Amino acid sequence: MVSGMSTEEEKEGTNDEEVSEEREVEETSEEEFPKLSIQDIELLMKNTEIWDNLLNGKISVDEAKRLFEDNYKDYEKRDSRRKAKKAASKKVKKTKKKEKSVEG
């Protein structure tokens, strides 16, 4: 024990390092994945059910393909509305900021 630390202190230091590494990993993983809306989760569940039915032989490949395409079309409609709504809200926020800076 040249460092002057007891083995307990060394263990605590190691645990602190492990905890900080875990936090970094959690933060990194949270940044990598986009937030999912309820509609996104519902789409994932529908697609999972289609795969399950296909693998169990309850539906044909053609039927599964049609269902996936229908789900995708519905998703595209929702996604385009969401993007349009986001763009409109950003424009409103920018104009409000400009008005405040002109007044101030």
From Swiss-Prot:
Binding site residues for DNA: E32
Single GO molecular function: RNA polymerase binding
EC number, UniProt record: 2.7.7.6
Stretches with biased composition (Basic residues): 80-104
Pfam families xref list: RNA_pol_Rpo13
Keyword terms, alphabetized: Cytoplasm, DNA-binding, DNA-directed RNA polymerase, Nucleotidyltransferase, Transcription, Transferase
Biased composition (Acidic residues): 7-31
Location(s), subcellular: Cytoplasm
Stretches for region Required to bind DNA: 81-104
GO cellular component: cytoplasm; DNA-directed RNA polymerase complex
Disulfide bonds listed in the record: none
Catalytic activity of the protein: RNA(n) + a ribonucleoside 5'-triphosphate = RNA(n+1) + diphosphate
Annotated spans, Disordered: 1-34, 76-104
Family recorded in the similarity comment: Belongs to the archaeal Rpo13 RNA polymerase subunit family.
Function: DNA-dependent RNA polymerase (RNAP) catalyzes the transcription of DNA into RNA using the four ribonucleoside triphosphates as substrates. A molten-globule protein, it binds dsDNA in the RNAP, in vitro binds dsDNA but not ssDNA. Its position in RNAP implies it functions in both transcription initiation and elongation.
Record's subunit section: Part of the 13-subunit RNA polymerase complex. Rpo1N and Rpo5 form a cleft which docks Rpo13. Forms predominantly dimers in solution, although monomers and trimers can also be seen. Found associated with RNAP but also as a homodimer pool in the cytoplasm in vivo.
Record text about domains: Forms a helix-turn-helix motif with helix 1 (residues 38-56) nearly parallel to helix 2 (residues 61-82); helix 1 contacts both Rpo5 and Rpo1N. The C-terminal region (residues 81-104) is required for DNA-binding.
Name under which the protein is recorded: DNA-directed RNA polymerase subunit Rpo13
Naturally occurring in which organism (per UniProt): Saccharolobus shibatae (strain ATCC 51178 / DSM 5389 / JCM 8931 / NBRC 15437 / B12) (Sulfolobus shibatae)
